[in-house]
């Protein structure tokens, strides 16, 4: 996929999935403020989600569908001329006792969390290799991959989030010589629309610091990993220390 000959990528271009709200919207706005071009994707998203600018393009669609990933990449190349980074933020999370999960539940979780990652990351890495100027791929996982919590029955969701951490480390080694970096951010409990109906006190009890993370805390970590030239294969926990053990 070659950019138009008349187009020169003056700024770096980021792709952000799950960009309509919460962490995704926060990181999209942060990149815009820092001078990046951004292609923002979500199932339901419009340009009005972000401040008026010619540096953001919007692609609506399910990232678990390969055609959506292709449209995102084509939009990045045709509009801005390059793909320099990806933030795989789109994700699904729900809990059930392990024995109650169905095949359909697993397909739903893996379709977005794993297949969605693969769909856009494969295309983006191919483009980064053509550009020969490195790149960054960051995904959002969960502190519960390393520190499960009794009573939060998220085993199948953690299969997918743990898989993201595994592929992050593998790809970091596979593409280190090409300067393409792969990292992950593992949040604890974040104040996003996903937790709108959850008890604040319960969420605070899941943090050693007794606090709920803000979206800005996760955004800062993603931006850091995107710009840290010699950091790859890392899982950066932003969870008030929850991954370290019992409290």
Segments and roles (model prediction):
Residues 11-12, 82-84, 128-142, 177-180, ...:
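Active-site loop of short-chain dehydrogenase/reductase
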Residues 20-21:
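Conserved glycine-rich cofactor-binding loop
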Residues 97-98, 105-110, 203:
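Substrate-binding pocket helix/loop in short-chain dehydrogenase/reductase
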Residues 138-163, 168-177:
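Catalytic loop of short-chain dehydrogenase/reductase
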Residues 180, 214-238, 243:
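C-terminal substrate-recognition "lid" of short-chain dehydrogenase/reductases
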């Amino acid at each position: 996929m070659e950019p138009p000959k008349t187009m020169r990528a003056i700024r770096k271009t980021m792709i952000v999935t799950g960009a309509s709200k919460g962490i995704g919207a926060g990181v999209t706005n942060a990149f815009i403020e820092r001078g990046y071009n951004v292609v923002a994707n979500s199932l339901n998203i419009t340009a009005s989600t972000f401040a008026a600018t010619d540096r953001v393009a919007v692609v609506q669609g399910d990232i678990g569908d390969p055609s959506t990933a292709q449209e995102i990449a084509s939009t990045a190349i045709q509009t801005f001329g390059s793909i320099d980074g990806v933030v795989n933020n789109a994700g699904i999370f729900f809990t059930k006792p392990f024995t109650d999960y169905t095949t359909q539940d697993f397909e739903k979780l893996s379709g977005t969390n794993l297949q969605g990652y693969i769909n856009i990351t494969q295309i983006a890495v191919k483009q980064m290799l053509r550009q020969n100027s490195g790149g960054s791929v960051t995904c959002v996982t969960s502190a519960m991959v390393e520190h499960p919590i009794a009573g939060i029955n998220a085993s199948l969701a953690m299969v997918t989030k743990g898989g993201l951490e595994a592929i992050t480390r593998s790809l970091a080694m596979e593409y280190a010589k090409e300067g393409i970096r792969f990292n992950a951010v593992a949040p604890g409990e974040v104040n996003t629309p996903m937790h709108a109906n959850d008890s604040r006190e319960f969420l605070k009890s899941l943090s050693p610091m007794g606090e709920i993370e803000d979206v800005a805390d996760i955004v800062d970590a993603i931006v850091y990993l995107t710009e840290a030239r010699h950091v790859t294969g890392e899982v950066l926990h932003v969870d008030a220390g929850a991954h370290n053990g019992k409290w």
